[in-house]
Amino acid sequence: MNIKLYIFALLSIFLMSSSTGADFYSSMTKVDYVEGSKTLKFTTKLNTEHISSAIKIRPETAGFEAEVKRYVNKNVDVYVNGSAKTLTFTGSQVNGESVWVYFEAKGVSEISQLKIRNSILLETYPKQFNVVNIAYKGQQKTMNFTRGRETNQVEF
């Protein structure tokens, strides 16, 4: 069932991006559970031009990383088993057309329910589509976020 959701998400992205004349905006986030440190590690890939427009600062400008950190903290919330988790920004990296953003939530021993609010770029780009892929103890889950559906949850 989970592989079907993942394939559907990828197919949806492909179909939406192949439409002629339509702008397409997306982000991808990978969430990995590290059992040894009881940490959820987030890696988010954003389009450089889109995030620069949203935070109104160019990546080569001093203070870009601080603005990205502030933006992520404002637009992402994580709840594990109903309890809010503090996200710690661990860095970002500009690589041409992509900005990679890294953050984590510590103190996660077991997950039966994971709820995420991801409104990254949804205010700036109404057609924005955010995909979050989660790996937890051998299980894979996928969440999709769009304007009007900024919050999603999965069960393990």
Model-identified regions with their sequence ranges:
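N-terminal soluble domains immediately following signal/targeting peptides that reside
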Residues: 21-156
